Amino acid sequence: ILGLVAIAALVSCTKEDNGNDTTIQEGTFPKEVTYKNENGKVASKLVSLIEGGKILSSEIEIYNENGTPIRTQKDIITYEGNLIKKRETIGTGDDPNYNSFTETFSYDGTKLVKSVTDYKKIVKTITTTYSYDGDKLTNMVKTEPIQTIENGQRVEGTKYTETNFTYNGDRITVKEKTYTKKPSGLITDENTSFEIYTVVGGNVVKKEVTYSPSLKETIEYTYDTKNNPMVNNLTKIILPDYFIEKSRGRNNLLTTTITQVRNNQTFVTKRYYEYEYNNKDYPTSQKHFIEENGQKKPAGSIEFQ
């Protein structure tokens, strides 16, 4: 979770629709982001160092319910030109083994073609490759070591996650296949899932998932017309599948309606988001609510400074 928050913050808030410029424009990037829980207590705080239009480092601190820091993660960023070449992460807390790693990025022009994550305190490397058809992402393949059993012995195999993207107008079908390859080449633990996204005006407006014949889920989203600090030119490079993430649309999320059909019964959950904005139409705060018994109840907030 820490890594996802850090990389999201790292690539946020540069100016979009400015050619291929990936540098940060003044007034669009929050140097400090504070996350609070439903009771108004600080859950985490992210502070970034910016020089020359680039984030050189960021540090996130996680707090327990009593407001005591329990975990930190610091990122040191290295660039090649205006593209991120390396992210060195040092973590402390309950599991520093998994919070300390180095991630390197390789490009073809400005397209990300490979990322490699090397953990510092455990022997583990995760590699992800990306393929494109023109400007469209078509395939991602992630490989990582995994412990498995072969011939009665515990051995190291490789877990594969293959993600394919098919485009049809506003609809994007995402097929994800996971499996384990043993040292002998035997394939086991195969699983395939499908998700369908509808993207309009740079925002995901619907996500459809069929988990089983008796369980289906449809999620519908609405947005404001302001600038989303989580999407920009650098986002599109470093996170090539950004376009299926609701939090990385062109605008800011206003409502989420989750409709689940389980065994012919329908269940609906609604979430709401409210914002304050600066004079550049970027959010300075977000309040999150969830609807229960027809009433909106606080579910957390974010402050941008």
Model-derived segments and spans:
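Sec-dependent signal peptide recognition
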Residues: 1-4
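C-terminal motif of bacterial Sec signal peptides marking the signal peptidase cleavage site
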Residues: 9-12
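Buried hydrophobic residues that stabilize the cores of well-folded domains
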Residues: 15-305
